[in-house]
């Protein structure tokens, strides 16, 4: 996500946001370190009204207990309710099969499902339900503005249980609260012919009849599924075997803007593949929109972004840092935002020197979670500028080529998995031993407030 980065500068303008009421954590006592439920297979069919703002459908999720103990329940995240919360929910669930649904909690963004029977380790279960989704009239990753419907974090997905318990963190408008495991999606989208659809995954089927178009998208090893619907125009090309498409509403975005974004996305893709390894998705869809503060939002294989140089490169970089190398975005937001911030400089002028960072307070740490930044929102830019500065410092110490070699190995080791701070620190320590004899990792982490 990019919502704090200034135009062409590496200094970030930190905005003060209104914070919604804090909601206490709901984590269970940890019983297993292995994340579960895993190997989820989502099957979704959804139908849009004429405007693309009301969707009805059915979702079926088959998942495995990848933990060491039986599961008698799971949790689903209903992130579509994040903005309106319980007072104005955007998604409603009915006709559930495979478990009993409790009342939603955490601002109606989390719901417990008691399974029909205890799920033993290594066994599978299936839960299905009908849903109605109302896309709100607003700018944002989930909203409709200027005739463009963005469905980011809209479909219900499984919450994660790991060594910290169930992750049931609250929705935060200025940050990301999302944490999910790599899964597969098969999503069939039924729309009026007038609506085009850009989505996660590849389109594998398409048919048209009676004024409507039915498209089926498939994606494997992805953490979520997002789509955009509108009467789009598009610019497309193939980059190193990867289809790249830039989607735009011509009444909102000029064709000349879409063309330079196409060139920028292509350059970013080529640069990042050389630096971090093969692009992790089948294709890249860039949906241009007018998100607030020249911002953007990343999803597997698709990004929603305002047309700015920094934002486009930043969101494409997230295809490696979060979409492929996953992390708990609420508990450790620096693990994707710092990396995307540093990476966004590579297509233009690689950031390889940053010897000093002006911390906004003595208490903030680069490794703080969103819980801290909800109390101190003006310090949230630390995970962008502070983390980017730290990585630039490492790039300068190691040399850019060696640093990229380290990052390629790190990305390979955690591809389609979940990383944490200790994994990155270990990668740096190994690289330091190889490239910088005498590198004092402990002093380095203290200096950059990595705990």
Where are these regions (language model features)?
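N-terminal, polar/Ser/Thr-rich
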Residues: 23-56
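Amphipathic alpha-helical substructures
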Residues: 54, 67, 380-451
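Zn2+-dependent metallopeptidase catalytic core
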Residues: 66, 118, 175-179, 183-197, ...
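Solvent-exposed beta-hairpin/edge-strand motifs
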Residues: 71-99, 152-155, 190, 194-195
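A surface-exposed beta-strand-loop module
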Residues: 83-148, 211
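Extended, low-hydrophobicity, Ser/Thr/Pro/Gly-biased non-transmembrane segments
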Residues: 130-226
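Catalytic zinc-binding patch centered on the HExxH motif and its immediate surroundings
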Residues: 260, 274-281, 288-310
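Zinc-dependent metallopeptidase catalytic helix centered on the HExxH motif
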Residues: 300-357
């Amino acid at each position: 996500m990019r919502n704090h980065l200034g135009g062409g500068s590496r200094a970030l303008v930190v905005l003060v946001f209104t914070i919604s009421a804090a909601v206490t954590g709901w984590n269970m006592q940890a019983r297993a370190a292995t994340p579960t439920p895993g190997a989820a297979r989502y099957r979704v069919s959804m139908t849009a009204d004429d405007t693309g703002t009301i969707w009805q459908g059915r979702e079926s999720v088959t998942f495995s207990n990848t933990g060491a103990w039986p599961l008698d329940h799971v949790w689903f995240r209903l992130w579509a309710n994040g903005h309106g919360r319980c007072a104005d929910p955007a998604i409603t669930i009915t006709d559930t099969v495979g478990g009993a649904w409790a009342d939603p909690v955490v601002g109606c963004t989390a719901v417990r499902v008691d399974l029909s029977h205890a799920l033993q380790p290594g066994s599978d279960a299936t839960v299905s339900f009908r849903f109605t989704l109302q896309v709100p009239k607003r700018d944002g990753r989930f909203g409709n503005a200027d005739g463009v419907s963005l469905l980011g974090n809209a479909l219900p997905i499984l919450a994660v249980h790991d060594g910290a318990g169930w992750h049931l963190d609250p929705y935060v408008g200025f940050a990301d609260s999302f944490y999910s495991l790599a899964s597969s999606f098969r999503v069939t989208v039924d729309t009026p012919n007038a609506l085009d659809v850009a989505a996660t995954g590849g389109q594998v089927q398409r048919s048209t009849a009676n004024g409507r178009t039915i498209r089926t998208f498939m994606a494997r090893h992805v953490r979520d599924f997002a789509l955009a619907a509108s009467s789009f125009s598009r610019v497309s090309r193939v980059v190193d075997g990867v289809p790249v498409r830039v989607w735009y509403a011509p009444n909102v975005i000029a064709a000349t803007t879409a063309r330079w974004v196409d060139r920028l996305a292509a350059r970013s893709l080529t640069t990042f593949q050389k630096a971090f390894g093969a692009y992790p998705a089948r294709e890249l869809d860039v949906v241009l929109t007018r998100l607030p503060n020249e911002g953007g939002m990343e999803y597997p294989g698709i990004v929603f972004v305002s047309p700015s140089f920094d934002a486009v490169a930043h969101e494409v970089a997230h295809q490696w840092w979060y979409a492929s190398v996953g992390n708990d975005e609420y508990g450790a937001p620096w693990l994707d935002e710092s990396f995307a911030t540093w990476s966004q400089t590579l297509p233009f002028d690689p950031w390889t020197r940053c010897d000093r960072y002006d911390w906004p307070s003595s208490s903030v740490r680069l490794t703080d979670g969103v819980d801290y930044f909800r109390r101190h929102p003006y310090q949230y830019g630390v995970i962008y500028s502070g983390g980017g500065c730290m990585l630039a410092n490492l790039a300068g110490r190691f040399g850019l080529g060696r640093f990229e070699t380290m990052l390629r190995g790190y990305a390979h080791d955690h591809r389609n998995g979940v990383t944490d701070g200790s994994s990155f620190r270990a990668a740096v320590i190994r690289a330091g031993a190889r490239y910088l004899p005498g590198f004092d990792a402990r002093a380095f982490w203290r200096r950059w407030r990595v705990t």
